[in-house]
Regions:
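Structural signature of alpha-solenoid helical repeat junctions
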Residues: 3, 37, 75, 108, ...
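Structural marker of alpha-solenoid helical repeat scaffolds
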Residues: 34, 68-72, 105-106, 139, ...
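TPR alpha-solenoid repeat register
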Residues: 41, 75, 79, 112-113, ...
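TPR/TPR-like (Sel1-like) alpha-helical repeat modules
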Residues: 67, 170-176, 187-213
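Residue-level recognition of tetratricopeptide repeat
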Residues: 13, 47, 85, 118, ...
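Short coil/turn linking the two alpha-helices of tandem helical-hairpin repeats
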Residues: 73, 124, 156-159, 193, ...
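Structural signature of tandem alpha-helical TPR/SEL1-like repeats
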Residues: 18-26, 52-61, 90-102, 122-135, ...
């Protein structure tokens, strides 16, 4: 056990919890170099590495967690879920889904529904995505991510924008800062000619903390804002 590493790791976790991500990364990096070895601290580090796209380093941290003795079933599940996300990002979506669906047989919760629901969309099978995301909403019909997933399913896979919007509207009512929901709703605003509202939504989305589980990227949002600024002669 590394007293110093874990002490710094606790500071990193506290910063992480306050959404001070840049500070958290710096502290996690230092803590890891000093031997941080508490599962919950390493988990926090791995999550932040995944969210910031440092997948090889995240995989290294996950392997360190896996080697620790006495992991609880919940910690093992969390490990497998994060490993699956890395696999997906490295181009192995089907293998990632196998791992997630195996875990899902033993644990059904909002997090699992939201992750698998989104990856079902990424797989591109509209019927499978609709069926799973319908089940997710039967589990919790107020979950913002599951509502957004259903909206994306209709928008991206089915091509039914009218039905999609009903889910995006419900999702934004649950989480007004949601990156993807704001992005998609901005597209409706643009079609309706409400440029002001579209820009407001895009700026809200741009201010979020992105992860691999977001459809919209900072680059996509910046491009859309630039397009609106050029088209309507605005300074954005």
């Amino acid at each position: 056990m590394s007293f110093m590493g874990n002490m710094i790791g606790n500071k990193a976790l506290a910063a992480h919890g306050k959404n001070e991500y840049e500070k958290a990364v710096q502290l996690y990096d230092e803590a890891y170099e000093k031997g941080m070895d508490k599962p919950r601290l390493l988990r926090g580090y791995s999550v932040l590495l995944i969210r910031t796209g440092h997948f090889d380093k995240a995989l290294e941290v996950l392997k360190k967690i896996e080697a620790l003795p006495g992991l609880t079933p919940a910690e093992k599940t969390d490990l497998h879920v994060n490993y699956a996300i890395i696999l997906w990002q490295k181009g192995h979506l089907d293998r990632a889904m196998e791992i997630l669906e195996d875990e899902f047989r033993h644990l059904k919760n909002g997090t699992m529904y939201s992750i698998i629901g989104y990856l079902k969309i990424e797989q591109g099978d509209a019927d499978a995505a609709l069926a799973f995301n319908k089940e997710a909403l039967e589990y919790d019909d107020t979950d913002a991510v599951s509502l957004d997933n259903m909206g994306q399913t209709y928008y991206r896979l089915v091509g039914d924008k009218e039905t999609a919007k009903t889910y995006f509207d419900r999702a934004i009512a649950q989480k007004s800062t949601a990156i993807d929901t704001n992005y998609f709703l901005s597209l409706y605003d643009i079609e309706a000619g409400d440029t002001e509202k579209a820009i407001e939504r895009l700026k809200t989305a741009r201010g979020g903390f992105f992860s691999p589980l977001n459809y919209a990227t900072p680059e996509m949002i910046d491009a859309k804002l630039a397009e609106l600024g050029t088209k309507y002669g605005r300074y954005i």
